Curated annotation (Swiss-Prot):
Cellular localization per UniProt: Mitochondrion inner membrane
Organism expressing this protein natively: Scomber scombrus (Atlantic mackerel)
Residues where heme b b566 binds: H97, H196
One Pfam family named in its UniProt record: Cytochrome_B
PROSITE patterns: CYTB_CTER, CYTB_NTER
Gene Ontology MF annotations: metal ion binding; ubiquinol-cytochrome-c reductase activity
Subunit details: The cytochrome bc1 complex contains 3 respiratory subunits (MT-CYB, CYC1 and UQCRFS1), 2 core proteins (UQCRC1 and UQCRC2) and probably 6 low-molecular weight proteins.
UniProt binding sites for a ubiquinone: H201
Recorded topology in the membrane: Multi-pass membrane protein
Name of the encoding gene: mt-cyb
CC per GO annotation: mitochondrial inner membrane; respiratory chain complex III
Record-given protein name: Cytochrome b
Signal peptide, first to last residue: none
Protein residues bound to heme b b562: H83, H182
Amino acid sequence: MASLRKTHPLLKIANDALVDLPSPANISVWWNFGSLLGLCLASQILTGLFLAMHYTPDVESAFNSVAHICRDVNFGWLIRNMHANGASFFFICLYLHIGRGLYYGSYLFVETWNVGVVLLLLVMMTAFVGYVLPWGQMSFWGATVITNLLSAVPYVGTTLVEWIWGGFSVDNATLTRFFAFHFLFPFVILAAAVLHLLFLHETGSNNPIGLNSNADKISFHPYFTYKDLLGFAVLLMGLTSLALFSPNLLGDPDNFTPANPMVTPPHIKPEWYFLFAYAILRSIPNKLGGVLALLASILILMVVPFLHTSKQRALTFRPASQFLFWTLVADVVVLTWIGGMPAEQPFIIIGQVASVLYFSLFLVLFPLAGWAENKVLGWT
């Protein structure tokens, strides 16, 4: 008699996705990050739910309600620290997951890749509205600066900004709607992640050599479930260590001051995981141009599959393209550093050079390197 997991309508779906899924035998630790992102999402939804039970989305009491969570709620300090630092780990896993996709040519699964880019945008929006909720100085001014960027939209910009604010400045209406969005978006992300998996399982996973692996597949369970559990343990140990020993390491000290519309902080900057895009935004001395560059810095990922010129899928056997890939990694690190620096020389020019290099790598250098490698190898 067939096992229940293979016949039950619901269990069969889970079985095909997590137990009997044929997986390439040679996938490395870089393929762990999908499941780690699932763990991050589950952790964020769970801790966020408990925080929402005690949080008050009102300008008069939001800051105090967060203090109340940390002081008076049972393990509230831990829940809050896990949630705040969980966001950082979420983005670390996201960026490593995207880097893996770029290195091994996983972007050639176009539907899966594009849903992934939409997921990235959703996670970024969720993190942004979430950062506003504690209603500290950086929350308030970050919200003011970033929402104000929409005023660069021709003709309807100002109306659009006031519509999002729910008034003539960032105020109670803004905070209330941002809380509503922050509560809703994780469930939208969950649905999009299911779609992401659905498209992935139509094609099967890529592998480190970028070749068809249909002849050499093994079942997901037990091999990769146990391999993923090791990743889970490392991630949870890292997250709990950060939350317990140095919970404010990645935060901004300004956010311990309640929001004050009368006092502008000396340096307004977002959380570390947005700094690379913020640096690109600031590198263009024009509001609309900066906003378009900011959008392009993320949306350029959607163009990557169409600019793939190499006859090989992965970068495993392509040293020239590997050099460009690591140049891109270094460039993003430089942009992240510049985004946290004041807008003055020499940081302005460094940011501009790094921004030009960022777009050049995607649009010109990677396609050229792929074409050159084909020529050298005699693949026409």
